[in-house]
């Protein structure tokens, strides 16, 4: 005679991975991570590929604060915290752009910023670059040929998406949208600068 399988008894043996609640069994965060490690995920294959590509990029990032931002964005993405992944990946991209301009184009940037707005005080640090609105910053770095106008258009779309995700509202974001967002940043910011 065949013994019946008792799911509750099986799950109880994995008390760190699943817990019994009044509504039934729930997978804990460590349990979800364990399933992801086993390859069990709701993420599409394309989304898993993007996360893998991003992890490969971490080693290439020289700036520690940028690396921490990108790593946190990847963790948000893998944990299906999509709005957070959008915000964190955008912050990482802006950090890369600020560092690149500061190290390689600061004089040209300040000249262009003053040409457009005579009240602009010269930036001397990456933090000073943060005084400028991000959309205006993108306009200035196009004008001094750090990025092209088509890249700016894509980055502006990413900025708009970040702004939508960074504030409470009804916007819904899925894995594929986040994969697209991160891929644009990966190809046009992280890999190039």
Question: What are these model-derived regions, one by one?
Answer:
Residues 1-2, 105, 170:
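Residue-level recognition of short, structured coil/turn motifs
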Residues 1-61, 185, 192:
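Internal, Lys/Arg-enriched amphipathic helical interaction segments that engage polyanionic partners
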Residues 4, 85-86, 172-175:
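Alpha-helix N-cap/helix-initiation sites
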Residues 15, 20-36, 143-193:
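Charge-enriched, short contiguous segments at helix-coil
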């Amino acid at each position: 005679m065949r013994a019946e399988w008792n799911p509750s008894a099986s799950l109880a043996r994995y008390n760190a991975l699943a817990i019994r609640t009044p509504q039934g069994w729930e997978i804990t965060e460590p349990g979800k991570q364990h399933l992801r490690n086993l390859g069990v995920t709701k993420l599409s294959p394309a989304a898993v590929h993007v996360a893998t590509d991003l992890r490969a990029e971490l080693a290439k990032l020289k700036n520690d604060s940028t690396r921490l931002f990108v790593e946190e964005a990847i963790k948000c993405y893998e944990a299906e915290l999509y709005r957070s992944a959008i915000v964190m990946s955008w912050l990482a991209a802006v950090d890369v752009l600020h560092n690149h301009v500061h190290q390689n184009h600061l004089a040209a940037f300040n000249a262009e910023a003053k040409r457009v707005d005579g009240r602009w005080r010269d930036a001397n640090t990456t933090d000073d670059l943060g005084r400028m609105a991000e959309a205006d910053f993108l306009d200035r770095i196009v004008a001094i040929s750090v990025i092209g106008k088509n890249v700016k258009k894509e980055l502006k779309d990413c900025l708009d998406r970040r702004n939508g995700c960074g504030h409470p509202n009804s916007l819904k974001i899925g894995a594929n949208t986040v994969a697209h967002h991160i891929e644009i940043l990966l190809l046009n910011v992280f890999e190039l600068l």
